[in-house]
Amino acid sequence: DGPAIIGAAWFAPTGAPIDPGAARRFVHAGQTVGWVIPAGERWDGPHTKGPELAIEGVLLRGTFDLLTALEELLPADCADFLAAPNDGVPVGSVVLGDPTHLVSLGANVEPGVVFDLRNGAVVLDQGAEVRNGTRLEGPVYVGPGTRILGGFIRASVFGSECRVRGEVAASVFLGFANKSHDGFVGHSVIGPWVNLGAGTTTSNLKNTYGQVRLEVDGQRIDTGRLNVGSLIGDHAKTAIGTMLATGTVVSVGANVFGTPMPPKYVPPFAWGCAGSERMTEDGFLRIAERVMSRRNVTFSAERRESLRRTFARSTRR
């Protein structure tokens, strides 16, 4: 029952929420991307017909389109925090640009951090930590409990409880992702519980300056983008010194080691890159439980079952 807004997972809307006061089907570029249900009405959809309302946003054809959404949405998303009560400029910080574009919501910032706010706001959420030796160039969002351990960070977003060091540009880190050492990550999407070994580096631009194509399980996908780094699935891991080519896809649960430069497509739950060896389900679950316990996250029966289903679905062939 309403009121409710139901959105397609493959569409990122822009602007303020819309309440047309009546049931409507949201449409973007000729496609149905959501529905709004007023209070007191029941939704029996999804429907592809009915009264429609045009809405602006970004269609997500695949994970790589999160990079386009990041470019288009992050500046405004960070700016939305500017009116919130916050801690102001931390003592000992160096600020380039308008200091009101730095929003600290209970973060811990060591002296000597550089905030470059000339191209966008920097938002540090509750419990975030930024160490000395860090330069943050907005727009940047640092999620609750995330630690920025040093380096140059620009135009990126980090979910909760990430660990980040080195150079990161125009990238999305989902929650609990770990990059605690030096190395460059650019125009990449890093899934939850990923661990990037020391020195892991992504290429985000072809030497030909041509558009990037992905190779996914035998299929080639045109991204239409000049800059695409790596798309790394949940719980994947890379060995120290790993070099990832432009447009590399590392699938869920894969453990990348055995070669400095892995192939551009690493299948789900791969164990190394030398052949077709795959992790066992029990082996994967044991590792996931160890990793989560280090972050004080309970490996519940529900979480275990969810990962079992993910393993089964991803390894059917």
Residue ranges and their predicted role:
Residues 1-100, 259-264, 268-317:
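Terminal amphipathic alpha-helical/low-complexity segments used for targeting or macromolecular assembly
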Residues 61, 119, 137, 189, ...:
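Conserved active-site and cofactor/substrate-binding residues in soluble primary-metabolism enzymes
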Residues 86-88, 109, 202:
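Beta-strand-rich solenoid/repeat architectures in extracellular/passenger domains
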Residues 88, 128, 175-176:
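Short Cys/His-rich Zn2+-coordinating modules
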Residues 96, 108-151, 156:
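Right-handed parallel beta-helix
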Residues 97-102, 187-190:
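Cysteine-centered iron-sulfur cluster-binding motifs in ferredoxin-type domains/subunits
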Residues 144, 149-152, 158-316:
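Glycine-rich hexapeptide-repeat left-handed beta-helix
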